[in-house]
Amino acid sequence: MVNLEPSESLLEGRRYLEWLASDCEIIKDYSLQGEEIWLLKIRLKNNGRKSKYIPDYSDWHVFIDSKYPNGNIQFYPSKKNGISCVFPHQSPHSEEISEEDYFRSNICLEQFSPSLEFDVEDANSKLYNYTEKALEWIKQAANGDLLADGDFFEKVAYPIKKFHKKVLFSEDEKSFVDWNKYEDERVGFLNMKAGKPGTEYQDFWYVTDYYKGVSGYMKKDATIISYSWGKYVTDEKSRGEKGIWIKLLSMPCIKPWQAPKNWPQLIKIFEENNLNFTEDVMPFLNNLRDRNSHVMMLGFPVSERIGGQISEMHWQSLELPVLSDYKTPNRFFKGFQKNIKGFEMADMRRIFFREKISLEWLSTKNWSPDNLVSRGNLSKDIKKRKFLFVGAGALGSMLAEMLVRSGVIQLDIVDYDVLEMGNLTRHSLTASDIGKYKATSMEKKLIESFIHYRGKGFNMTVEEFFKKQDFDMNEYDVIIETTGNDKVLDLIASKKLNLIVISTSLGLYAKRMYINIQHGSKVELTKFKESILEWIEKDREEFSHMEYPRDGLGCWHPLFPARIDHLSMLASSSMSIIESDILQTKESLTIIERGELGTVSILKRKEFTDGD
């Protein structure tokens, strides 16, 4: 049943606003909006400088969840006596609904003041705290201080209507250096590749190449920048798409912090960036008169932090309207023939001069490798190395997936075995891979785990792999052996490989894990086997009373016993050891042991020197 009266918590929160004295005035008490939202209209004082954008007092619609103090609190500027423009830490003006008396552009108070998200949800203080932060936001907006030097760069909030469509690019510091080589190139064509047809990803557009010149599209000698997407993108048999790129001197923005709404506003921004729309841009648009919509990408240089060094090219895309051609109605030409000049004039009349035609901004994301793994990535020195995995069993699959999901792009896998149903208890692969080779199945999984992954699976023994005619061990930096097989260890050692060789193996029931790391061409794995021999014997003694699991009826064959949670604990710990020792160029033998309640400890650690 809907409660038609505000709760005691809501009333208590409103009473606390009295402590804000003359800074906050309630102009209309609570009113119920639907079943779950209460509206409180207030007037807030500008305690900052005089501003042409912000009045001395502004009216606000405050929407509060009926479950207060739980739930959201959102501040929207009123259309009458409110703030009509957009500032940083504020959502864009979405398409206005005329009967509403407020702008749908709430202040992002949790972003402006992250501590609000962690405040204790107390009826006495929550509404007061949010209102106090709104007052501070107004003050800083008036003073021009919402973005200060040292803050992370914030892009203008471009209003998006077609959220299903995304334009994806991959820019970093290296590509920015490449862009600087073409400083005089301001406009050109680009090529994009669509996601998998017939799926929800078919409207994901991956930019692949940028070209210079009106006649440069898809010409190798006209290529400026090409992104190195992984197999997830490059192997997809999908259609390409022609678009246009324009490089600006700064982010396309209308003061104080608003995305341009229409073509006249955007064309004015082009002029401010020393670009003439009819002379510099229109010749490229004339190549897109095919009755289809196309994408326009606007690029601009940015820094990671406000006031910092410019280090990256960022892009914002929009969807172009269908341009005029011979099928366009005659009424748009008015004295002009249906030729290039006539098409241009028709477009200016029906599209580019009209303020009522809104720009169709598209969701645009930088899916560079570093950006995609920023929530949990490895060091750059690890990510840039090329790995070879020998063995794609439970341990190998876990370690390989951890490395790739953490940003490793080049990782090949060698394994001749096929996946069996019993493997699923602790393997990264799934039931759809039963009966398939582990190596190529892992390749497929890693491709879908990280879109920049470019590794390969080889369905063969390591002996066969080393004998391949096109095999070149110099292309790898690290080899990780996860088989625990003495013959494989001996073979790797005999090759005198001038790289980092890592051997990992598990004890019974994943009680212990053995990690050996050696550098250079003098890899000696005999000492490794000798060093862990006593611990292997200890495994046998400790678990002598245990009966090994079997794989169904028939001829008895013991299986390696280990639970997936125990295995993943040791694998995760070994990742940290491997990363640390590679970065510090250490050679070592480390034995880690699983303890009680999910703990892992180092049982033995020996770091080798040249004399060892």
Would you name each region that the model predicts?
Residues 1-56, 60-63, 156, 164, ...:
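Long, charged/polar, low-complexity intrinsically disordered N-terminal extensions
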Residues 28-110, 125:
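Compact alpha/beta protein-protein interaction domains typified by the UBC
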Residues 81-186:
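Domain-scale recognition of soluble eukaryotic interaction modules
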Residues 158-349, 474-612:
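Glycine-rich phosphate/adenylate-binding loop
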Residues 324-387:
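N-terminal charged helix/coil linker that caps or initiates catalytic domains
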Residues 377-418:
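Glycine-rich adenosine-cofactor-binding loop
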Residues 416-451:
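Glycine-rich phosphate-binding loop and adjoining beta1-alpha1-beta2 segment
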Residues 443-475, 483-486:
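A structured beta-alpha segment of the ubiquitous adenosine-cofactor-binding alpha/beta core
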